[in-house]
Amino acid sequence: MPADGGKGLLDTNILILRNRIEHGALPAEVAISAVSLAELSAGVHQAHGPEASAERARRLLLLQQVESEFDPLAFDATAARHYGRIAGAVSAAGRSPRRRVADLMIAAVAAAHQLPLYTTNPADFSGLGEFVEVVAVPRPHSEG
């Protein structure tokens, strides 16, 4: 779905891929959740393997760019109440909300601020349509 010039909340994957995402696929005004900052920060410390040092540096640079560009929306009491309803619905549908905590918290922030949620992973938010509008953004052809 193309952007309509409004405002939207970006999922963490959009922050990681956004330099390669088609500009018109995102809203004119974008916001992020503090939960996405937490995911990006954790990613810096979870880089392992033979290229870990270079990967940590790349992830840290992305985190610093995002921190300097955005004033994230907090996961506050209103978002917490939305999270409770969302997690309850996920559980009632027979799925475990525990494996999806960060995604559900991001969805709750979007719901609390009445913002559509832009993601390249819409399946992560399946079944949440009554709580938040999920906008599927095409993945870039080359992610490398």
Identify what each model region corresponds to.
Residues 123:
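Flexible glycine-rich beta->alpha loop in the catalytic core of nucleotide-sugar glycosyltransferases
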Residues 120:
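Conserved acidic donor-binding loop of glycosyltransferase catalytic domains
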Residues 2-8, 18-108, 126-144:
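PIN-domain endoribonuclease scaffold, especially VapC-family toxins
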